[in-house]
Regions:
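PLP-dependent amino-acid enzyme catalytic core
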Residues: 1-177
Length: 177
């Protein structure tokens, strides 16, 4: 909204069409001027296929497609700028992982002595292949034991640990990631 970008959100689950006000993320996006295209869960499975994208182009005209999670070559390149010379003394760089873009940028820009550890918010082994699309380095590892059953799921113990960690370090952590 501030930059004048016209945005269209392709939303999985056409049942959400009448529940925008109940969803803080959709409400905020709508307040910022985003238009929505609600699609069935079945249709959403085809979101990266040419025919699906062409249907969107017919309806909305020319657009730049930001993939789910935001991961693409430009995102990875941008995330390569996260680490700076001030981070050179760290041996480990840890990051939450959603779709792999941020950690890919960190892997590409980490120094030879640094190991990048990623903690996926999603269950499943698909992220290894996604990350390999963007990196050649071997300086990384995914720690896959902390997804708590899937995206956005947490346990009481995890929240307690996050609070303890914040009290010890002053670093806030995101419970979703």
């Amino acid at each position: 909204k501030e930059q004048g970008f016209e945005t269209i959100g392709v939303i999985r689950g056409d049942e959400l069409r009448d529940k925008i006000s109940e969803n803080p993320t959709l409400s905020f996006a709508q307040e910022c001027g985003m238009r929505f295209e609600f699609v069935t869960r079945e249709a959403y499975r085809h979101k990266t296929e040419t025919a699906f994208i062409e249907q969107l182009q017919v309806k909305f005209g020319s657009f730049y497609l930001v993939p789910e999670g935001g991961t693409n070559d430009l995102a990875v390149k941008g995330c390569e700028e996260i680490l700076t010379e001030f981070d050179a003394h760290f041996d480990f760089v840890c990051s939450a992982v959603g779709t792999g873009g941020t950690i890919s940028g960190l892997i590409n820009s980490a120094l030879p002595h640094q190991k990048v550890l990623g903690f996926p918010a999603l269950k499943g082994d698909f992220l290894q292949n996604e990350i390999h699309k963007f990196v050649n380095n071997k300086n990384w590892e995914l720690i896959t034991d902390y997804h708590f059953g899937g995206y956005g799921k947490v346990t009481t113990e995890f929240i307690e640990w996050m609070n303890w960690f914040y009290a010890q370090t002053g670093i806030p952590l995101d419970p979703i990631y």
